[in-house]
């Protein structure tokens, strides 16, 4: 579960290191976001010569959460960190590589580009 002010890690090679959620998209009263949801993030820390700079605001897709995701068979998949992939205004990934595993739920959400770039799909 991601909400405003949640600290996040970047799971791509866009150049961002640390991000913070500034808005959960999808309605004015929506408080939490989970895997497969799109949020607004601000870059808090970035590497030099990266595609993104500190202070910039982007859309981001949540790919891993510590809360995890519950499957229909009752299993629960949890991760060690909260990670996102930065997206441009057309909701295409900014980076060209994805680091770490992603879940099958992204396939249902029609983010096939991110699923195909990921090294492992759980």
Swiss-Prot record:
SMART domains: Ribosomal_L14. GO terms for cellular component: cytosolic large ribosomal subunit. Keywords: Ribonucleoprotein, Ribosomal protein, RNA-binding, rRNA-binding. PROSITE patterns: RIBOSOMAL_L14. GO terms for molecular function: large ribosomal subunit rRNA binding; structural constituent of ribosome. InterPro entries: Ribosomal_uL14 (IPR000218), Ribosomal_uL14_bac-type (IPR005745), Ribosomal_uL14_CS (IPR019972), Ribosomal_uL14_sf (IPR036853). One of its GO terms (biological process) is translation. Part of the 50S ribosomal subunit. Forms a cluster with proteins L3 and L19. In the 70S ribosome, L14 and L19 interact and together make contacts with the 16S rRNA in bridges B5 and B8. Belongs to the universal ribosomal protein uL14 family. Binds to 23S rRNA. Forms part of two intersubunit bridges in the 70S ribosome. NCBIfam families: rplN_bact. This is Large ribosomal subunit protein uL14. The lineage of its organism: Bacteria, Pseudomonadati, Pseudomonadota, Gammaproteobacteria, Chromatiales.
